[in-house]
Amino acid sequence: KLHLLGYGIEKDGGIYHMCEDIKSKKRELIHGIIDSLIARGYRFDKKDLEMLFSMNDKALTKVDIARLLVKYGEARSVNEAYNTILAPYKIGSKVRAEASVVTSLIKEDNGICILAHPGDIEKKYGIDILDILDDLRKIGIDGIEVFNSKHTPEDVVRFLKIAKERSLLITGGSDYHGM
């Protein structure tokens, strides 16, 4: 599971439409999670749900549900709600796209494609980013996110060296998803 970032893409291109389709699928999955939680005895205020689903520009996530669970006193924090009550519910695996498709669409839309938080990938999957970087470059990766809130200073030095040696673009980000 890789996170790819598209910079400078055209607003109404193929990647935009693919993201809109994914957003729509995620809304359906979020609706299903809420239905399941209600069946398990959790209560949701109708007005809160109406407001949540009226945000058409927003890609709904489990974090949105977690915030409501905290509001209703079902958990002390968003992280607690996310990691306990919502842990059994998987969304990401149901709305993924192949990396080659994503990079191709970003390129068709005149964008550049960046591999997000490579340090996180290494830690989660126990792989060395160098083992997959050449394959990623072949499918269109233009750069890597060197500066990231999850990267240690040593990670930053290492990824900066890797990017420079391979003439890859260098970016930074926080990986903040509202939690």
Language model: regions and residue ranges:
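Conserved, well-ordered alpha-helix/loop/beta-strand core segments that scaffold catalytic motifs
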Residues: 94-123, 127-137
